Amino acid sequence: MPKVGMQPIRRQQLIEATLTAIDQVGMGDASIALIARLAGVSNGIISHYFKDKNGLIAATMRYLMNALIDNVHERRLALTDDSPRAHLQVIIEGNFDASQVNGPAMKTWLAFWATSMHHPSLHRLQRINDQRLYSNLCCQFRRVLPLPHARKAARGLAALIDGLWLRGALSGDAFDTAQAQRIAYEYMDFQLAKQVS
């Protein structure tokens, strides 16, 4: 009989083991057996909680996405300035938060992006994540720019955030958060300077 209250603990253990496994050997070689061994559980526990490896990968991605959402939300709650610039800054900061730019998270995101092109459920998660970023950026740009310009600025900043993140992930060096934020802020300020009086 399973212990009461163990499900959230086990699920988190398995998600953390998945991040570690992908960091160590990549998504393709991150087998159920390896993940279970890293988590200190039997292979059957993964099937019990997640059905299969794809279910575990989807849960791991939801975990990373929720960490991103939570980071942005916490930063927004701490804002004393309600300007579009301040809100855009916290979105940028959240996307370059340590929870998103550490080695295991970056390797998992990269593997997820590649895999999502071939798995409909993962592709759906990627589209949700992409749309959320675009929508949040557009909402803030829309406060000061006409809609067509706000959409274009949001698309550009989303692409820049993803591009900076991707370049950092592939560089092999520690992610330079300050530099990435500085570049994104410059683009943001350039777009905000176009505001209609």
UniProtKB/Swiss-Prot annotation:
InterPro entries on file: BetI_C (IPR039538), DNA-bd_HTH_TetR-type_CS (IPR023772), Homeodomain-like_sf (IPR009057), HTH-type_TetR-like_transc_reg (IPR050109), HTH_TetR (IPR001647), Tet_transcr_reg_TetR-rel_C_sf (IPR036271), Tscrpt_rep_BetI (IPR017757)
Pathway: Amine and polyamine biosynthesis; betaine biosynthesis via choline pathway [regulation]
One Gene Ontology term of the molecular function aspect: DNA-binding transcription factor activity
Regions recorded as binding DNA: 31-50
UniProtKB keywords: DNA-binding, Repressor, Transcription, Transcription regulation
Domain HTH tetR-type as annotated: residue spans: 8-68
Domain of life: Bacteria
GO biological process terms on file: glycine betaine biosynthetic process from choline; negative regulation of DNA-templated transcription
PANTHER family named among the record's database cross-references: HTH-TYPE TRANSCRIPTIONAL REGULATOR BETI, HTH-TYPE TRANSCRIPTIONAL REGULATOR RUTR
Functional note: Repressor involved in the biosynthesis of the osmoprotectant glycine betaine. It represses transcription of the choline transporter BetT and the genes of BetAB involved in the synthesis of glycine betaine.
Name this protein carries in UniProt: HTH-type transcriptional regulator BetI
